[in-house]
């Protein structure tokens, strides 16, 4: 059994779509990044790679590579799944937290879960996604960015 911890953060900017968990969420700002800047999926990828001792997403999908410009993070997550499976690991479970003042994530979590479970070929009870705010504190509380944490267990 191996545990992995992932974290990601992206700045909120105008003229970008807000994509979290593979879901496009209606909002006046989106996350800035080389790919689609999906903080939740990025945190999950880092947790999985960390648990398998395979580095991080920057090692496998560098932002200097034009092939990853605006790419769907779910596509990258599928590649991470292949990497950890190649090493002989399988996912036992993943638990995630999205930290955002706005927009409210509650209404989108089921769709996020469906996207990620489909991508990773997980049963619904193997993935948990929750969301919280920082009560107006810090960069997420001031709506300057959104972050996500993920922890996973591999066998």
Swiss-Prot record:
This is 2-C-methyl-D-erythritol 2,4-cyclodiphosphate synthase. InterPro entries: MECDP_synthase, MECDP_synthase_CS, MECDP_synthase_sf. It holds the Pfam family YgbB. PROSITE patterns: ISPF. Keywords: Isoprene biosynthesis, Lyase, Metal-binding. CDD domains: MECDP_synthase (cd00554). A divalent metal cation binds at residues 8, 10, 42. Its cofactor is a divalent metal cation. Involved in the biosynthesis of isopentenyl diphosphate (IPP) and dimethylallyl diphosphate (DMAPP), two major building blocks of isoprenoid compounds. Catalyzes the conversion of 4-diphosphocytidyl-2-C-methyl-D-erythritol 2-phosphate (CDP-ME2P) to 2-C-methyl-D-erythritol 2,4-cyclodiphosphate (ME-CPP) with a corresponding release of cytidine 5-monophosphate (CMP). Binds 1 divalent metal cation per subunit. HAMAP family: IspF. The keyword Metal-binding applies. Belongs to the IspF family. It catalyses: 4-CDP-2-C-methyl-D-erythritol 2-phosphate = 2-C-methyl-D-erythritol 2,4-cyclic diphosphate + CMP. GO terms for biological process: isopentenyl diphosphate biosynthetic process, methylerythritol 4-phosphate pathway; terpenoid biosynthetic process. Homotrimer. One of its GO terms (molecular function) is 2-C-methyl-D-erythritol 2,4-cyclodiphosphate synthase activity. NCBIfam families: ispF. Its EC number is 4.6.1.12. Pathway: Isoprenoid biosynthesis; isopentenyl diphosphate biosynthesis via DXP pathway; isopentenyl diphosphate from 1-deoxy-D-xylulose 5-phosphate: step 4/6.
């Amino acid at each position: 059994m191996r545990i992995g911890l992932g974290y990601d953060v992206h700045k909120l900017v105008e003229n970008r779509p807000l994509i979290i968990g593979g879901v496009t969420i209606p909002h006046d700002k989106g996350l800035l990044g080389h790919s689609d800047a999906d903080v939740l999926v990025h945190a999950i990828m880092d947790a999985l790679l960390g648990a398998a001792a395979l580095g991080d997403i920057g090692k496998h999908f560098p932002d200097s590579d034009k092939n990853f410009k605006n790419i769907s993070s779910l596509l990258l997550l599928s590649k991470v799944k292949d990497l950890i499976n190649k090493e002989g690991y399988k996912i036992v479970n993943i638990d995630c937290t999205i930290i955002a003042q706005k927009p409210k994530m509650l209404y989108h979590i089921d769709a996020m879960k469906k996207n990620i479970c489909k991508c990773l070929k997980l049963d619904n009870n193997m993935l948990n996604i929750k969301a919280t705010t920082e009560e107006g504190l810090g960069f997420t509380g001031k709506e300057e960015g959104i972050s996500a944490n993920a922890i996973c267990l591999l066998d």
